[in-house]
Amino acid sequence: MRGFFRWLGIVVASLLALFVIAVGVFVAVFDVHPGRGIGDQSYIVTSRDGLRDEYRLGIGSLDVDLSRMQFPLGVTYLDTRVDVGDLHVVIPPGVAVRGYAEARAGHVNVLGKEDDNWNADVDLTGTGPRVLDLTAHVGAGSIRVERAVR
C-alpha cells in the first residue's frame, strides 16, 4: 500500500509541474499581464476630454463605447489591448477608422472585415474629416469593432 501512495504522489506532483509549466508557457506566449486587471470593464465615452489614450486589460472583456462621443475634426488616436479575452469597440456614424487590429490567436471583425486563427489581423484605411486611428490588440480572444446605429 505504501508503494501505491508513493506512486500517487509522484503522479500528482508530475501533473502539477506540467500544469505550472503550461501556465508559464501560455503567459509568455500571449504576453499576459494580470496587473492590468481581470474581469469585465466597460467605458462609455461622451467627450474627447473623457477619452483616454489607451485602454488595457489583462484578462476578461473590455468594452469601449464611443457612440455618444462628438469627434473633433482631424485624427483622434486610441490604443486598446486585452491580453486574454474579448475587446469590443463601438464607433459613431460619420467617423472614419484607420489603423490596425490583431489577435495573436482568435478572431478579428472590424466593420465587417474578418480574419481568424493564428495572427489574425485587419488593416484599416479610412479617411475623412473625422478619423479614429485605432490600434486594437488581443493576445488570445476576439476583437469586434462595429458602428453604432442611430
Briefly describe each language-model feature range:
Residues 1-10, 31-32, 146:
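Cytoplasmic membrane-interface segments at the C-terminal ends of transmembrane helices
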Residues 23-42:
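Hydrophobic alpha-helical transmembrane segments in integral membrane proteins
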Residues 1-2, 13, 17, 87, ...:
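Intrinsically disordered low-complexity regions specifically enriched for long asparagine
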Residues 37-57, 61-150:
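Short, surface-exposed interaction patches in beta-rich subdomains
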Residues 9-26:
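Hydrophobic membrane-insertion alpha-helices, especially the h-region
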